[in-house]
Amino acid sequence: MPQTPPFSAMFDSSGYNRNLYQSAEDSCGGLYYHDNNLLSGSLEALIQHLVPNVDYYPDRTYIFTFLLSSRLFMHPYELMAKVCHLCVEHQRLSDPDSDKNQMRKIAPKVLQLLTEWTETFPYDFRDERMMRNLKDLAHRIASGEETYRKNVQQMMQCLIRKLAALSQYEEVLAKISSTSTDRLTVLKTKPQSIQRDIITVCNDPYTLAQQLTHIELERLNYIGPEEFVQAFVQKDPLDNDKSCYSERKKTRNLEAYVEWFNRLSYLVATEICMPVKKKHRARMIEYFIDVARECFNIGNFNSLMAIISGMNMSPVSRLKKTWAKVKTAKFDILEHQMDPSSNFYNYRTALRGAAQRSLTAHSSREKIVIPFFSLLIKDIYFLNEGCANRLPNGHVNFEKFWELAKQVSEFMTWKQVECPFERDRKILQYLLTVPVFSEDALYLASYESEGPENHIEKDRWKSLRSSLLGRV
């Protein structure tokens, strides 16, 4: 059975392979080409272009692009039903005398399409309707020859393994979430249980950066490409009266990753605001600056930005006496790299450098590219907007589909990198489960460390002491 190539090979620098579409489909009604590039088409024609026949198999770039973006216009199970129908029609329309021969020719192509779908978008098949259609079509193929039976079995086993791994991962996330508590609550009830800080758990900033990279890559790995589209699907564009967002919004892994970013920011702020002594707070700031710098060197831009965000939170940034004891030159450089001006120009330049390094990498470490995720989401949001708008003639704007697919396929390449660093369970456990302060608790800790400087801060301090500590 043909193996699918890596995602990095799917798109050239211009966004897609420009010589893929010189096929019999060029004259197909409902598709519009320019210089052999597919620019637009009716939804029905695009679906037909996805389905193989005896003389044709769609390019993998097209398969990925259409399976990714078509969900802006229809449910995946609706697309699967249409694909099944067209495959059966192709078989029926063939000469009855050569029916078995035709099936023998088309079966491996249909099986390859199903394999690509189940490998790249396995989460689609958590829907029972999808799985039912898949099994029906797979049964048709398997009833032919022994070879196909084995390949169908292999495809189904691989899919079931992926879905089982996802369920297991979600259970772990749910367990972590259910046991998470506010640090102030724990301090008031069991103060002896939080006597450690991050430096006592891991005194080496380089090791901490590596463990953060473990968490980032694990969480990235479970994000399905379709989540980038489904996150922005509000309702079915073909049915203006009925919202289907609740059914289609399957973006748990993407949301869990965004929550991780927020947790890391609050963890950094908590660790800085906790120490009673000024020199210990200054030491903690310098420690996180070194962690952030190593994250930058690794190519872990998401942890880097989360650390900078935590250090820039008001409860931390207002600690002027603490910051006065910190050597900030390294921090200034990192802030400059992640400066949001000119649409994050400096960061985007650094990201391109890391992506280029990844392409020519000689080691797993050089392959690591972990983008600043919130910005990636923002970029993809605007691409989704363009994809969802049909052209005046009712055609789907496939040129926009290409742009979206290129961005997501690059992400797919990055998320498949294996983390080369040794895991430290003790450090990972601390990073994922140690209680952190809420925003109010951070302000209270900050005011307790360095007193209020004006009437507004004094009033807030009194209010927080009263509400959080029951003191006046």
UniProtKB/Swiss-Prot annotation:
Residue span(s) of domain N-terminal Ras-GEF: 34-164
GO MF: guanyl-nucleotide exchange factor activity
Keywords, alphabetical: Endosome, Guanine-nucleotide releasing factor
SUPFAM superfamilies: Ras GEF (SSF48366)
Principal localisation: other
PROSITE patterns: RASGEF (PS00720), RASGEF_CAT (PS50009), RASGEF_NTER (PS50212)
Ras-GEF domain: residues covered: 204-452
Annotated CDD domains: RasGEF, REM
InterPro entries: Ras-like_GEF, Ras-like_Gua-exchang_fac_N, Ras_G-nucl-exch_fac_CS, Ras_GEF_dom_sf, RASGEF_cat_dom, RASGEF_cat_dom_sf
Domain of life: Eukaryota
One GO BP annotation of this record: Ras protein signal transduction
Location(s), subcellular: Early endosome; Late endosome; Midbody
Example of a GO cellular component annotation carried by this entry: midbody
Record text on subunit structure and interactions: Interacts with CCDC124 during cytokinesis. Interacts with Ras family proteins.
Protein name: Ras-GEF domain-containing family member 1B
Species whose genome carries this gene: Pongo abelii (Sumatran orangutan)
Gene transcribed to yield this protein: RASGEF1B
